[in-house]
C-alpha cells in the first residue's frame, strides 16, 4: 500500500456489491507495505521513506483514515515486508513469466510471508 487508494476503493466496491447480493461474505482486507515505508503498519508518519518499491514509497498516506477504517471494518491486517522479501517475490514471479514492478511484488511477498 502507498496512499491506500486502491484498498479503500476495493473495500467500497465489495460493500456496494454485498448490499445487493448478500449470499457472499465480505473479504478480510490485507495490505502490505515495505518495512522502510510503513506508516499504516506502524501508525506513524515516516519522514524519509526508503524502499526499492518506489510506487509505495509514501510516508504519509492521503487515505490514512479511510485505510484504518477498512482494516477495522473488514477485520483485516496491515503488515510490512522487507525489500529482500519484495525482491525474492519479484524473482519468483519472473520465473513464472509474470513481470511486475516491485510495489506489486510486495503483495506477493506478504502472502508468502503468511
Place the predicted regions along the sequence by residue:
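Gly/Ser/Thr-rich loops at beta-strand to alpha-helix junctions
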Residues: 1-7, 104-106
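Short Gly/Thr/Asp-enriched flexible loops that form oxyanion-binding sites at enzyme active sites
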Residues: 7-17
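Amphipathic alpha-helical interaction segments
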Residues: 88, 106-109
Amino acid at each position: 500500500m502507498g496512499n491506500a487508494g486502491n484498498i479503500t476503493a476495493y473495500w467500497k466496491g465489495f460493500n456496494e456489491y454485498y448490499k445487493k447480493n448478500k449470499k457472499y461474505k465480505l473479504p478480510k482486507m490485507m495490505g502490505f507495505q515495505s518495512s522502510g515505508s510503513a506508516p499504516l503498519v506502524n501508525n506513524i508518519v515516516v519522514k524519509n521513506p526508503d524502499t526499492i518499491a518506489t510506487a509505495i514509497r509514501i510516508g504519509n498516506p492521503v487515505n490514512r483514515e479511510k485505510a484504518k477504517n477498512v482494516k477495522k471494518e473488514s477485520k483485516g491486517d496491515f503488515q510490512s515486508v522487507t525489500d529482500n522479501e519484495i525482491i525474492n517475490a519479484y524473482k519468483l514471479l519472473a520465473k513464472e513469466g509474470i513481470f511486475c514492478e516491485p510495489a506489486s511484488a510486495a503483495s506477493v511477498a506478504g502472502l508468502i510471508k503468511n
